Amino acid sequence: MKHLLDNNKLSLSNIDKISESKAKYLIEEKGCKIKSIKRIPEGSNHYSFDVILDDGTPLIGKFKKNKNNLRDTLFGGRISLERECVLYSLIRKKTGLPVPKLYGKYKNGGISFILVEKLPGKLWSDYIRENNYSTSCFLKSLEYLGQDIARLQKVTFETFGDLMNEYLVLPKGIINFADRFIGITKMRLKRVKGKNVLDTKKVHLVKKYFFQQISEIREHLYNYKSKPVLVFTDVHSRNYLVNDFGKPSGYFDLESCQSAHPALEFYGLKFFLFNYFNYETFKKAEDSFFAGYKKEGGVYDRGDYINKKLEDLLAINRIMELNESYYGIKDGLRDTWSMKFKELLFEAIEINGVNYSKIADIIRAKDGQPKNPG
């Protein structure tokens, strides 16, 4: 099989062209005989493969993409396979939640990759679809999720930032979440300006809005008033697994975990899950989630003014990020997403609030769920 390396010049310079056959060769070079391998078309930072070994062991193979100093697009932190493995271990140790076990960490021809446990279950979005978008299945699944998030938030830290391991949060020394918010906002605005997504006048308006709004609640965001907690950050319909009853069976997208104000998790749930159907279902979804959350000892006060304001600010900031990240994408599905998120951004700034149903109406094209559940 050496011709795979010779003919395709497999190296860090063209890892972006890695195929199933190349991945198979690299893995087998490390002594793992493969029965089958299939590319998983998800993931922006790694190439992932569904692997079955000759003995029937199911695994997931993750290969680092050829990007020097790979940075997390959401928070700017350093992303690596090593960090991901450390976070798997940390979350399993501290919470007992279902995350992958490491099978092996390798380097071959300058290319880094890992093999991890393939977790059981199906994507949450598939579970909801296979149950005919049942309201009861939807709500029960969110109650289960609430229990897990409560367990996760029992893990606390001293400062805010990118969670690198149990003892290291970067950047060091951020004791007020407002400073973390400002740093992330500056990073995102820099990308917006660099791609000419917004003109100078609009960039100034957006910057002024975020800085003014966060300053109004800054005194409430110190670490001694709201303890930094472990946050997944990006839970959505296609990045965690559930069993046949809707109970989470696997969390695998953990490379961007944060030590953060808990609002960072809750805005995302409103952004991607609670709003999955319509406005009427949103409140029921939120109630079901928090029933599970409280049952497991969760302490976040969703009715608190500061928490609600911070959630909305984080959501509006994410809308800005999506306006930028989808800018210029023409794939037949997301051609108009950037423009639509831009409209939502300035609507949200004008009303100083978020219409989460409109967010769902944009993203709905990907999962194809109806507006009204069964």
What are these regions (language model features)?
Residues 163-164, 323-345:
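Hydrophobic/aromatic-rich alpha-helical bundle segments in the mid-to-C-terminal region
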Residues 92-95, 106, 149, 153-160, ...:
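A general structural signal marking secondary-structure boundaries and capping sites
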Residues 14-33, 135, 154-233, 243, ...:
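An alpha-helical support segment within catalytic cores of ATP-dependent transferases
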Residues 263-298, 312-333:
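Active-site activation/catalytic loop segments of kinase-like enzymes and analogous catalytic loops
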Residues 10-12, 67-79, 130, 276-284, ...:
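Short, flexible/disordered intra-domain loops and linkers
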Residues 62-63, 103-104, 230-233, 251-253, ...:
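Short beta-strand segments
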Residues 44-52, 60-61, 112, 212-264, ...:
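Active-site acidic catalytic loop and adjacent metal/ATP-binding pocket
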Residues 38-172:
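ATP-binding pocket architecture of kinase catalytic cores
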